[in-house]
Amino acid sequence: MAAAEEGCDAGVEADRELEELLESALDDFDKAKPSPAPPPTTSAPDASGPQKKSPGDTAKDALFASQEKFFQELFDSELASQATAEFEKAMKELAEEEPHLVEQFQKLSEAAGRVGSDANSQQEFTSCLKETLSGLAKNATDLQNSGMSEEELTKAMEGLGMDDGDGDGNILPIMQSIMQNLLSKDVLYPSLKEITEKYPEWLQSHQESIPPEQFEKYQEQHSVMGKICEQFEAETPTDSEATHRARFEAVLDLMQQLQDLGHPPKELAGEMPPGLNFDLDTLNLSGPPGANGEQCLIM
């Protein structure tokens, strides 16, 4: 009996020791258990993700998106493709140097996109284009005639916010190129030549139905158009810069005379590329800025 009790006590003691061992092991496990990981925090936006575009970039994108429509409306399809390529190249260079100037050109494109049959929309576009070209012409002429040294010119451009710091001075040639392309032989000559060739027959068939005073103006229009065509036909690849400049000024003077004579007959003006409509106000570079053009002035 005593032996049995001793055996029982030994078993209980062994169970107690096992229980203590297990509890000790559990305590050690709890101490070694790593603390819970902190909840994941919201990561900051990826710096390489989409960024908000600057006003200059926005204007540039909008301008490139609309310029093709602008030239399609202003010129015929073949010339529009060439003008689009030249304009896009020039504007990309300009956008890198002067984003705020791109925004001004965008206003011109937007005005062209709103041109419709009503007089108000046409006036908005013609006024905008006239004042844009007036600003380009005035500043180009002033700089050429100022006699400023290279250093003085650089300082002046810095004062106008036109210095990009690399000293390339590409703004003026770009402005001149755009202006001369708009008033070039490729743009004006084809339509003017076609109207000039059709004018004599039209005058003959309408002489009896038109008031004498108006008929005389149409005759003068025909004569001036012929002189403009002669200026363009006199161009040669070997012409000097002075010759180009003199011819450009002569064409501007003739276009002013043409404007003073009023619009040509609708039957003939219809031969002009869509969007141009022979509105000579768009080419009047010598007149004072109009009230509506102030929003479109570049310089």
Swiss-Prot record:
Ubiquitous. Residues 1-63 are annotated as: Disordered. A lipid is attached at C296 (S-farnesyl cysteine). Residues 2-56 are annotated as: Docking to the peroxisome membrane and binding to PEX3. It is found in: Cytoplasm; Peroxisome membrane. Necessary for early peroxisomal biogenesis. Acts both as a cytosolic chaperone and as an import receptor for peroxisomal membrane proteins (PMPs). Binds and stabilizes newly synthesized PMPs in the cytoplasm by interacting with their hydrophobic membrane-spanning domains, and targets them to the peroxisome membrane by binding to the integral membrane protein PEX3. Excludes CDKN2A from the nucleus and prevents its interaction with MDM2, which results in active degradation of TP53. This is Peroxisomal biogenesis factor 19. It comes from Cricetulus griseus (Chinese hamster). The gene is PEX19.
